[in-house]
Swiss-Prot record:
Localization in the cell: Cytoplasm
Protein name: Elongation factor Tu
Family as reported in the entry's similarity comment: Belongs to the TRAFAC class translation factor GTPase superfamily. Classic translation factor GTPase family. EF-Tu/EF-1A subfamily.
Source species: Francisella tularensis subsp. holarctica (strain LVS)
GO BP field: adhesion of symbiont to host cell
Amino acid sequence: MAKEKFERSKPHVNVGTIGHVDHGKTTLTAAITKVMAEKNGGMARKFDEIDSAPEEKARGITINTSHVEYESPNRHYAHVDCPGHADYVKNMITGAAQMDGAILVCSAADGPMPQTREHILLSRQVGVPKIVVFLNKCDMVDDEELLELVEMEVRELLDQYEFPGDDTPVIMGSALRAIEGDEAYVEKIVELVQAMDDYIPAPERDTEKPFILPIEDVFSISGRGTVVTGRIERGVVNVGDEVEVVGIRPTQKTTVTGVEMFRKLLDRGEAGDNVGILVRGLKRDDVERGQVLCKPGSIKPHTKFEAEVYVLSKEEGGRHTPFFKGYRPQFYFRTTDITGAVELPEGVEMVMPGDNVKMTITLINPIAMDEGLRFAIREGGRTVGAGVVAKIIE
């Protein structure tokens, strides 16, 4: 049979399984692919295929991640599953696998465990918009009241981290029994995917978001003016648009007088395009790498923020020794390094290679930033950590 062609007609949504080790994340992933393949076409994937996750590199960090895909009646899902807890931490902090929503897997037999909490916290810190819950291994619990108790605990945990516990869909089932073909449990997988369809919002397309282009280079072309180059991160820019240059120095306004790509003049550029943009009235020295060109008022420069950070282990090429408060590395945002000072949370004296930690960072120059922006931590050009802006302070 010929390969089915990739259907572009359905909206594409990125999800992932999160939760404590051995609560059944990978088994659930296998169950969803099997049930959806039977109902809507596509490939069923076995536990072993998913579990032997290939290594990937994201921002110089090695992460083991498995990618599967499946179709619901309304959507095409790309789904990530990680074998180890450390892989989740790295994956979520680096944004290697962007998640529009997460499926929290919690064993009904064990209830919430430390990593259940930690993955919910990470989801909050890195800006995962919605979580749906699958209470797994319900076939091992005879007591209705016990199931209700675990459900209540999970909802309370979600509330603690500012997810709407009461409104979150909670599906009770057994991934293993669904794989074995037990009809009652297959139905629960269908219910779960239906809950994802209903509860996880389809992501806004990159082209619909406000325009932003991280500036990589600046040239001056005699007789034409100043050109900034870079890859449009999101949004669309048209010739004639007013834009701002934000970051490092005071914000400046200008107008786009030309957009070129591969030496051809265009009327517009959009997310993903590598372009040169001609800007009116700015000199070559007014603009520098590390600033962004953006829709006026859409993004502000900031210097102080709270971040969730993963520190590379020695084996990953990171530091060999811990760092302490007052640590001053470079923070690499988009296209440039900015020096900053680190404050650690109360009671944390030092951070070891391989740890993840919440910290407050103060940069010496402002950078255009939103919550959710990813960055690398570097020492002399070598990556020693990865982070994400969790909360802007000033």
